[in-house]
Amino acid sequence: MKTILSNQTVDIPENVDITLKGRTVIVKGPRGTLRRDFNHINVELSLLGKKKKRLRVDKWWGNRKELATVRTICSHVQNMIKGVTLGFRYKMRSVYAHFPINVVIQENGSLVEIRNFLGEKYIRRVRMRPGVACSVSQAQKDELILEGNDIELVSNSAALIQQATTVKNKDIRKFLDGIYVSEKGTVQQADE
């Protein structure tokens, strides 16, 4: 069954500016600019009101799968707005039973070097995604902090670090060593 029209709106905060170029959304905020291309999805994007402070996503004559993209696009735009206002921060903790994992940050936080993982001599190097900065926490031992505006790049960088410390040819229920995401949040606290 096809639904005639499905639409949803996203409210845009005062300090955020959104521009549309076709189906490309550009979000400008206090922390920077993010752009995302939705050309592969057949929907209508429009800005509403005199001050253009609402973004509407329309889908005409869609089946169930196509209608789901409406909410997905709204969620992506909300994540972009949150990114340029508050920023995203992931915290990761080193876990080890015997050999202490030594993490060194190189190239102004864009390269992570992992040494002494399970006592190995091999140095694991993980490059951060563009726009993601990594630092070692001063308050907490064995903690990494990843910060950026794009939630997908920050979470992907965290995944690359976690996957770099996978234990091969051992029972992973016993060998729990690695670097894991311990906390997900924002750089600045939202005023609620």
From Swiss-Prot:
Assigned keywords, A-Z: Acetylation, Cytoplasm, Ribonucleoprotein, Ribosomal protein
Subcellular location: Cytoplasm
GO MF terms held by the record: RNA binding; rRNA binding; structural constituent of ribosome
Classification via Gene3D superfamilies: Ribosomal protein L6, alpha-beta domain
N6-acetyllysine modification, residue list: 121
Listed PROSITE patterns: RIBOSOMAL_L6_2 (PS00700)
Keyword flag Acetylation: yes
Cited Pfam families: Ribosomal_L6
GO CC entries: cytoplasm; cytosol; cytosolic large ribosomal subunit; cytosolic ribosome; focal adhesion; membrane; nucleus; ribosome
One BP annotation, GO: translation
Top-level taxonomic group: Eukaryota
Family: Belongs to the universal ribosomal protein uL6 family.
Family matches, as PANTHER family: 60S/50S RIBOSOMAL PROTEIN L6/L9 (PTHR11655), LARGE RIBOSOMAL SUBUNIT PROTEIN UL6 (PTHR11655:SF46)
Record text on subunit structure and interactions: Component of the large ribosomal subunit.
Function in brief: Component of the large ribosomal subunit. The ribosome is a large ribonucleoprotein complex responsible for the synthesis of proteins in the cell.
Name this protein carries in UniProt: Large ribosomal subunit protein uL6
Organism the protein comes from: Homo sapiens
Gene designation: RPL9
